[in-house]
Amino acid sequence: MKFKVNNKEVYASTGGQPFDKNKPLIIFVHGSGLSHITWVLQTRYFAFHGYSVLAIDLPGHGYSEGPSIKSIEEQGKWVADVIDAVVMKEASLVGHSQGCLITLECASQFPNKVRSLALMGGAGAIPMNPELLELAEKGDPKAVDLMMDWAHGPAGHFGGHAVPGLHHINIGGTIVINGSVKNALGVDFRACDNYKNGFEAAKKIKCPTINILGDKDRMCPVKEGKKLADSIKSSEIVIIENCGHMILLEEADKALAILKKFIINHHPSK
């Protein structure tokens, strides 16, 4: 589905079903340099069970018009603009990694627009390794290889993707194919590194929130995820065992089961 946000063309996957304004809305926000395709194993369920789904491509990512937005605060506002653009009053937000920072910021700035918040592989701050940041800003594809290697837990390195023929780590190849290492991944990494408002934003969250963490996550370790959860008033924590940072791919079924229970409880469909 393509639509306009702030006069720029935006693409979002609707999970295989037409967008319906009469159904509750769930917006899925991807991580650094990635796109809507990371959510394919979660979005279809909700799209076929009474929800309208938007797995968005952030500006400058996937099929969305650029340029990439350079700060987490502005990206959070942009998600609120998406809700307005599709003429909806509110949405449940699901974010992964950088998407957690973005959805956290959106829920903080616009509490009346966010019904529930699911943070997957999140933390209150995501400081970047200086060498990795430099590689990404130079447009070096090695940045993608390092990111995907570091993002996956031990089991994720051996495959086992729920979709036959696909491999978890190879999803990073979409960044290289799209030529977006510098202009998407580099910008995203810099935005994460610059963002210092996470814990202040967390204190302002009013909606029900869940933190889904992987016990083998090296990018946003469990202890950092717990710090964020402790800063949010109405928050719960679920830890998935033997799982790295790419929870939505490494343990897609478990992630979906957790999301189903949480969203259906706090934002039921008719």
Can you say where each PLM-predicted feature lies in the sequence?
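Flexible "cap/lid" loop of the alpha/beta hydrolase fold
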Residues: L101-L146
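Short beta-strand/loop motif that positions the catalytic acidic residue
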Residues: I205, N211-L213, D217
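Active-site loop/oxyanion-hole signature of alpha/beta-hydrolase fold enzymes
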Residues: N7-G15, V40-F48, S52-Q98, A257
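Catalytic active-site module of serine/aspartate enzymes centered on a nucleophile-bearing elbow/loop
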Residues: S235-K270
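Active-site glycine-rich loops that stabilize anionic/oxyanionic intermediates
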Residues: G31-L34, S97
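Conserved alpha/beta-hydrolase catalytic His-Asp/Glu region
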Residues: E134-K204
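Alpha/beta-hydrolase fold catalytic core
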Residues: M1-I27, F48-Y51, M88-K89, K260-K270
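Conserved alpha/beta-hydrolase "acid-adjacent" motif
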Residues: R218-E224
